[in-house]
Amino acid sequence: MSIDLGLPKVREVLSPRRKTRRIKLGKVFVGGDSPILVQSMTTTQTTNIDATLQQIAELTAAGCDIVRVAVPSRDDAQVLHIIAKKSQIPVIADIHFQPNYVYAAIDAGCAAVRVNPGNIRKFDDQIGKIAEKAKAAGVSIRIGVNAGSLDPRLLEKYGRPTAQALVDSAVWEAGLFEEYDFHDFKISVKHHDPVTMVKAYRLLAERGDWPLHLGVTEAGPAFQGTIKSSTAFAVLLAEGIGDTIRVSLSAPPVEEVKVGLEILRSLGLRERRLEIVSCPSCGRAQVDVYRLAEEVTKGLEKLTVPLRVAVMGCIVNGPGEAREADLGVASGNGKGQIFVRGQVIKTVPESEIVPTLLEEANRLAGEMPFSSGSPTIAIV
């Protein structure tokens, strides 16, 4: 028998994915039913070909799907053909100020070109030629509107880079590209303030079926930037908005990719990977949880399977969390109960907890399907 308590129905956490047109970036697709992709940007001088390709290789190994490279000079533009040819993932050329570099990037075989309508010289007058060359070459465009370089006309109209100002700029440029029958573009409307950024993307999502690239610009150092991007992305992705993401951090680019992938995994938008769940420790803990979690994480960092490992420090939440994991330990009184898929398989001394978990994890990994990416860590 069911009893109606008159409580409101619980909404689904994630709304259906917003329906967008699908565009091609090299060997990957963006929008439509394609997965949400993670993007980053190299921090090397693009003219340093070896260093740039090395960083792209590191990003690829970390799970990056698309990489952007800076093109601030003619020398950078002249080496793009080498970068684009040797990169393992699609390359987007980042162009500001000089329209000639847009054409150079298209000719170089880049998968896409990011154009900034706020600072490229006489940009509106260039769109016809850009659309013609990009269409002929099969190159897509990202219309990258940024609060820090908004069109002066819109700044005069709105007084500051408001959400509506960002959207007006993006919609205007999108309309010009479409007038030339060019539709292979995605749009970003980045702002340093997560609330303004969310407002802008919500407004933009209502205006057309363009794929959207999410980003909080100038997000800040690793901790602050992670919080800002995670907050904004979670809101938008939960509403079905977003087709590619970049977590902008004042940190090595690989860290951007790790955070981006973890945001997607946390929302169930990417396949789960190795996950270490550990308690934050408290006065009840009878073992050094921090040390155990760190040693287990280090010992399993090369595993590439969707395995959940719980490292718990006491008998309050420990047994429950350990039972819910694929593998876990509930510790106390100098020993640990080892759980495998909900069942206690043995009790070992504290000194044997880490070796036992590593042994069991590798055994379980051999029975599981292959996955890819970096391990994730959750503190519960």
Curated annotation (Swiss-Prot):
EC class of the enzyme, as a word: oxidoreductase
Cofactor: [4Fe-4S] cluster
Reaction equations catalysed: (2E)-4-hydroxy-3-methylbut-2-enyl diphosphate + oxidized [flavodoxin] + H2O + 2 H(+) = 2-C-methyl-D-erythritol 2,4-cyclic diphosphate + reduced [flavodoxin]
Gene Ontology molecular function terms on file: 4 iron, 4 sulfur cluster binding; 4-hydroxy-3-methylbut-2-en-1-yl diphosphate synthase activity (ferredoxin); 4-hydroxy-3-methylbut-2-enyl-diphosphate synthase activity (flavodoxin); iron ion binding
Keywords, comma-separated and alphabetical: 4Fe-4S, Iron, Iron-sulfur, Isoprene biosynthesis, Metal-binding, Oxidoreductase
One GO BP annotation of this record: isopentenyl diphosphate biosynthetic process, methylerythritol 4-phosphate pathway
Pathway the protein acts in: Isoprenoid biosynthesis; isopentenyl diphosphate biosynthesis via DXP pathway; isopentenyl diphosphate from 1-deoxy-D-xylulose 5-phosphate: step 5/6
Keyword match RNA-binding: no
Entry's cofactor comment: Binds 1 [4Fe-4S] cluster.
EC number from the UniProt entry: 1.17.7.3
Keyword Transport appears in the UniProt entry: no
InterPro entries attached to this UniProt entry: Dihydropteroate_synth-like_sf (IPR011005), IspG_bac (IPR016425), IspG_bac-typ (IPR004588), NO2/SO3_Rdtase_4Fe4S_sf (IPR045854)
Pfam families membership: GcpE (PF04551)
Family: Belongs to the IspG family.
Function: Converts 2C-methyl-D-erythritol 2,4-cyclodiphosphate (ME-2,4cPP) into 1-hydroxy-2-methyl-2-(E)-butenyl 4-diphosphate.
Name of the protein described by the UniProt record: 4-hydroxy-3-methylbut-2-en-1-yl diphosphate synthase (flavodoxin)
Annotated source species: Tropheryma whipplei (strain Twist) (Whipple's bacillus)
